Protein backbone atom coordinates (compact mmCIF):
# COMPACT_ATOMS: atom_id res chain seq x y z
CA UNK A 1 0.00 0.00 0.00
CA UNK A 2 3.03 2.28 0.27
CA UNK A 3 2.69 3.43 -3.34
CA UNK A 4 -0.81 4.75 -2.59
CA UNK A 5 0.34 6.87 0.36
CA UNK A 6 1.33 9.64 -2.07
CA UNK A 7 -2.34 10.23 -2.95
CA UNK A 8 -4.64 12.56 -1.03
CA UNK A 9 -7.71 11.60 -3.05
CA UNK A 10 -8.62 8.17 -4.43
CA UNK A 11 -11.85 7.80 -6.38
CA UNK A 12 -13.64 4.86 -7.98
CA UNK A 13 -16.19 4.27 -10.70
CA UNK A 14 -19.13 2.12 -9.56
CA UNK A 15 -20.54 -0.16 -12.28
CA UNK A 16 -18.11 -3.01 -13.04
CA UNK A 17 -15.51 -1.49 -10.73
CA UNK A 18 -16.94 -1.53 -7.20
CA UNK A 19 -20.30 -3.16 -7.98
CA UNK A 20 -21.71 -5.45 -10.65
CA UNK A 21 -25.13 -6.86 -11.52
CA UNK A 22 -26.05 -10.11 -9.76
CA UNK A 23 -27.89 -11.20 -12.90
CA UNK A 24 -28.19 -9.63 -16.34
CA UNK A 25 -30.79 -6.88 -16.80
CA UNK A 26 -32.50 -9.18 -19.31
CA UNK A 27 -33.08 -11.88 -16.70
CA UNK A 28 -34.01 -9.41 -13.95
CA UNK A 29 -36.41 -7.53 -16.22
CA UNK A 30 -37.90 -10.84 -17.33
CA UNK A 31 -38.61 -11.94 -13.76
CA UNK A 32 -40.27 -8.65 -12.81
CA UNK A 33 -42.11 -8.45 -16.14
CA UNK A 34 -43.67 -11.85 -15.49
CA UNK A 35 -45.05 -10.58 -12.16
CA UNK A 36 -46.84 -7.83 -14.07
CA UNK A 37 -48.08 -10.12 -16.84
CA UNK A 38 -45.45 -9.03 -19.38
CA UNK A 39 -43.84 -12.31 -20.39
CA UNK A 40 -41.11 -12.40 -23.01
CA UNK A 41 -37.82 -14.08 -23.83
CA UNK A 42 -34.97 -12.99 -21.56
CA UNK A 43 -32.49 -13.01 -24.45
CA UNK A 44 -34.72 -10.62 -26.38
CA UNK A 45 -34.99 -8.41 -23.30
CA UNK A 46 -31.21 -8.39 -22.89
CA UNK A 47 -30.68 -7.44 -26.54
CA UNK A 48 -33.34 -4.73 -26.49
CA UNK A 49 -32.24 -3.36 -23.11
CA UNK A 50 -28.75 -2.83 -24.53
CA UNK A 51 -30.11 -1.21 -27.69
CA UNK A 52 -32.40 1.10 -25.73
CA UNK A 53 -29.61 1.97 -23.28
CA UNK A 54 -27.42 3.22 -26.13
CA UNK A 55 -30.34 4.99 -27.81
CA UNK A 56 -31.40 6.78 -24.61
CA UNK A 57 -27.85 7.86 -23.83
CA UNK A 58 -27.50 9.21 -27.35
CA UNK A 59 -30.85 11.02 -27.48
CA UNK A 60 -31.20 12.02 -23.81
CA UNK A 61 -27.69 12.25 -22.30
CA UNK A 62 -27.01 11.98 -18.59
CA UNK A 63 -30.36 10.35 -17.75
CA UNK A 64 -32.17 13.27 -19.38
CA UNK A 65 -30.43 15.99 -17.38
CA UNK A 66 -28.57 17.36 -20.40
CA UNK A 67 -31.61 17.54 -22.71
CA UNK A 68 -33.75 20.57 -23.45
CA UNK A 69 -36.27 20.56 -21.91
CA UNK A 70 -34.71 18.64 -19.04
CA UNK A 71 -36.07 15.13 -18.48
CA UNK A 72 -36.43 13.78 -14.95
CA UNK A 73 -34.27 10.71 -14.46
CA UNK A 74 -37.29 8.58 -13.43
CA UNK A 75 -38.98 9.47 -16.72
CA UNK A 76 -35.77 8.51 -18.54
CA UNK A 77 -35.90 5.03 -17.02
CA UNK A 78 -39.63 4.66 -17.73
CA UNK A 79 -38.98 5.44 -21.37
CA UNK A 80 -36.12 2.91 -21.52
CA UNK A 81 -38.17 0.22 -19.77
CA UNK A 82 -41.19 0.80 -22.03
CA UNK A 83 -39.03 0.61 -25.17
CA UNK A 84 -37.23 -2.53 -23.99
CA UNK A 85 -40.46 -4.46 -23.38
CA UNK A 86 -42.29 -3.12 -26.44
CA UNK A 87 -39.46 -4.22 -28.74
CA UNK A 88 -39.42 -7.61 -27.00
CA UNK A 89 -43.06 -8.22 -27.90
CA UNK A 90 -44.66 -7.40 -24.54
CA UNK A 91 -45.67 -3.75 -24.49
CA UNK A 92 -46.58 -2.48 -21.01
CA UNK A 93 -50.04 -0.83 -20.94
CA UNK A 94 -49.88 2.85 -20.00
CA UNK A 95 -51.95 2.29 -16.86
CA UNK A 96 -49.38 -0.26 -15.60
CA UNK A 97 -46.18 1.44 -16.76
CA UNK A 98 -45.79 3.80 -13.80
CA UNK A 99 -46.07 1.12 -11.11
CA UNK A 100 -44.07 -1.39 -13.15
CA UNK A 101 -41.17 0.96 -13.85
CA UNK A 102 -41.16 2.26 -10.27
CA UNK A 103 -40.84 -1.32 -9.04
CA UNK A 104 -37.73 -1.81 -11.19
CA UNK A 105 -36.31 1.61 -10.27
CA UNK A 106 -36.63 0.80 -6.55
CA UNK A 107 -35.29 -2.73 -6.99
CA UNK A 108 -32.10 -1.44 -8.61
CA UNK A 109 -31.27 0.50 -5.45
CA UNK A 110 -30.72 -2.75 -3.59
CA UNK A 111 -28.36 -5.68 -3.12
CA UNK A 112 -31.00 -7.87 -4.78
CA UNK A 113 -29.67 -6.55 -8.10
CA UNK A 114 -26.09 -5.60 -7.19
CA UNK A 115 -23.10 -7.28 -5.59
CA UNK A 116 -19.49 -6.22 -4.94
CA UNK A 117 -16.97 -6.86 -7.70
CA UNK A 118 -14.11 -9.26 -7.05
CA UNK A 119 -11.80 -7.66 -4.48
CA UNK A 120 -13.63 -4.36 -4.06
CA UNK A 121 -14.63 -4.73 -0.40
CA UNK A 122 -11.23 -6.05 0.65
CA UNK A 123 -9.46 -3.18 -1.11
CA UNK A 124 -11.69 -0.54 0.46
CA UNK A 125 -11.23 -2.10 3.89
CA UNK A 126 -7.45 -2.05 3.49
CA UNK A 127 -7.42 1.53 2.25
CA UNK A 128 -9.51 2.64 5.20
CA UNK A 129 -7.22 0.76 7.57
CA UNK A 130 -3.92 2.09 6.23
CA UNK A 131 -4.68 5.59 4.93
CA UNK A 132 -5.62 8.17 7.55
CA UNK A 133 -8.98 9.83 6.73
CA UNK A 134 -7.64 13.32 7.41
CA UNK A 135 -4.84 12.76 4.88
CA UNK A 136 -6.58 10.74 2.16
CA UNK A 137 -10.22 10.86 1.08
CA UNK A 138 -12.00 8.02 -0.71
CA UNK A 139 -14.85 8.79 -3.09
CA UNK A 140 -16.94 7.69 -6.03
CA UNK A 141 -17.31 9.43 -9.40
CA UNK A 142 -20.01 7.75 -11.47
CA UNK A 143 -22.20 8.38 -14.48
CA UNK A 144 -25.28 7.56 -12.45
CA UNK A 145 -28.63 8.92 -11.35
CA UNK A 146 -29.46 10.17 -7.82
CA UNK A 147 -30.03 6.63 -6.52
CA UNK A 148 -26.26 6.27 -6.09
CA UNK A 149 -25.98 7.15 -2.35
CA UNK A 150 -28.84 4.77 -1.47
CA UNK A 151 -27.28 1.99 -3.55
CA UNK A 152 -23.92 2.41 -1.80
CA UNK A 153 -25.68 2.35 1.55
CA UNK A 154 -27.71 -0.76 0.71
CA UNK A 155 -24.59 -2.61 -0.48
CA UNK A 156 -22.68 -1.43 2.63
CA UNK A 157 -19.92 0.28 0.67
CA UNK A 158 -20.79 3.73 1.99
CA UNK A 159 -19.00 2.98 5.28
CA UNK A 160 -15.65 3.11 3.46
CA UNK A 161 -16.33 6.24 1.41
CA UNK A 162 -16.20 9.95 2.21
CA UNK A 163 -18.45 11.03 -0.66
CA UNK A 164 -20.13 9.91 -3.87
CA UNK A 165 -20.76 12.09 -6.92
CA UNK A 166 -23.36 11.18 -9.53
CA UNK A 167 -23.37 12.80 -12.95
CA UNK A 168 -27.06 13.75 -12.90
CA UNK A 169 -26.81 15.98 -9.85
CA UNK A 170 -23.59 17.74 -10.89
CA UNK A 171 -24.79 18.09 -14.51
CA UNK A 172 -21.61 16.62 -15.95
CA UNK A 173 -20.83 13.11 -17.19
CA UNK A 174 -17.42 11.50 -17.43
CA UNK A 175 -15.24 12.15 -19.40
CA UNK A 176 -16.19 15.81 -18.78
CA UNK A 177 -13.41 17.36 -16.64
CA UNK A 178 -16.03 19.14 -14.52
CA UNK A 179 -17.10 15.96 -12.72
CA UNK A 180 -13.51 15.26 -11.66
CA UNK A 181 -13.08 18.85 -10.54
CA UNK A 182 -16.28 18.53 -8.50
CA UNK A 183 -14.72 15.53 -6.75
CA UNK A 184 -11.64 17.56 -5.85
CA UNK A 185 -13.89 20.24 -4.37
CA UNK A 186 -16.06 17.68 -2.57
CA UNK A 187 -13.00 16.15 -0.90
CA UNK A 188 -12.58 19.30 1.17
CA UNK A 189 -8.80 18.95 0.96
CA UNK A 190 -6.97 22.27 0.84
CA UNK A 191 -4.54 22.98 -2.00
CA UNK A 192 -5.25 19.58 -3.58
CA UNK A 193 -3.30 19.10 -6.82
CA UNK A 194 -4.31 16.82 -9.73
CA UNK A 195 -1.13 14.78 -9.35
CA UNK A 196 -2.24 13.92 -5.80
CA UNK A 197 -5.40 12.24 -7.13
CA UNK A 198 -5.95 8.68 -8.34
CA UNK A 199 -9.05 7.46 -10.19
CA UNK A 200 -9.84 3.78 -10.70
CA UNK A 201 -12.46 2.60 -13.17
CA UNK A 202 -13.35 0.23 -16.00
CA UNK A 203 -13.92 2.79 -18.76
CA UNK A 204 -10.83 3.29 -20.96
CA UNK A 205 -12.17 6.66 -22.18
CA UNK A 206 -14.55 7.78 -19.44
CA UNK A 207 -12.35 6.77 -16.51
CA UNK A 208 -8.71 6.07 -17.34
CA UNK A 209 -7.93 8.54 -20.13
CA UNK A 210 -10.28 11.25 -18.80
CA UNK A 211 -8.49 11.30 -15.45
CA UNK A 212 -5.03 11.24 -17.07
CA UNK A 213 -5.88 14.21 -19.29
CA UNK A 214 -6.61 16.23 -16.15
CA UNK A 215 -3.23 15.40 -14.66
CA UNK A 216 -4.59 12.74 -12.32
CA UNK A 217 -3.09 9.28 -12.01
CA UNK A 218 -5.41 6.50 -13.09
CA UNK A 219 -5.81 2.74 -13.07
CA UNK A 220 -7.92 0.74 -15.50
CA UNK A 221 -9.84 -2.33 -14.33
CA UNK A 222 -10.62 -4.23 -17.52
CA UNK A 223 -10.93 -7.86 -18.58
CA UNK A 224 -9.58 -7.31 -22.10
CA UNK A 225 -5.90 -7.78 -22.92
CA UNK A 226 -3.48 -4.88 -23.00
CA UNK A 227 -2.94 -5.46 -26.74
CA UNK A 228 -6.67 -5.11 -27.38
CA UNK A 229 -6.92 -1.94 -25.28
CA UNK A 230 -3.96 -0.24 -26.96
CA UNK A 231 -5.25 -1.13 -30.43
CA UNK A 232 -8.70 0.29 -29.66
CA UNK A 233 -7.87 3.23 -27.38
CA UNK A 234 -4.29 4.20 -28.21
CA UNK A 235 -0.80 4.23 -26.75
CA UNK A 236 -1.65 6.43 -23.76
CA UNK A 237 -2.71 3.36 -21.79
CA UNK A 238 0.12 2.21 -19.51
CA UNK A 239 0.50 -1.57 -19.38
CA UNK A 240 1.49 -1.40 -15.69
CA UNK A 241 -1.74 0.39 -14.77
CA UNK A 242 -4.20 -2.12 -16.28
CA UNK A 243 -5.67 -4.79 -13.99
CA UNK A 244 -8.22 -7.58 -14.58
CA UNK A 245 -9.95 -6.83 -11.26
CA UNK A 246 -9.61 -4.88 -8.03
CA UNK A 247 -8.42 -8.13 -6.47
CA UNK A 248 -5.45 -8.10 -8.86
CA UNK A 249 -4.91 -4.36 -8.28
CA UNK A 250 -4.91 -4.91 -4.50
CA UNK A 251 -2.43 -7.80 -4.75
CA UNK A 252 0.03 -5.89 -6.93
CA UNK A 253 -0.22 -2.77 -4.78
CA UNK A 254 0.42 -4.86 -1.65
CA UNK A 255 3.43 -6.50 -3.32
CA UNK A 256 4.87 -3.11 -4.25
CA UNK A 257 4.62 -3.97 -7.93
CA UNK A 258 2.94 -0.74 -9.07
CA UNK A 259 4.88 2.46 -9.69
CA UNK A 260 3.13 5.75 -10.45
UniProtKB/Swiss-Prot annotation:
InterPro entries: HAD-like_hydrolase_domain, HAD-like_sf, HAD-SF_hydro_IA, HAD-SF_hydro_IA_REG-2-like, HAD-SF_hydro_IA_REG-2-like_cap, HAD_sf. Pfam families: Hydrolase. Induction: Maximally expressed at predawn or early morning. GO terms for cellular component: mitochondrion; nucleolus; nucleus. NCBIfam families: DREG-2, HAD-SF-IA-v1. This is Rhythmically expressed gene 2 protein.
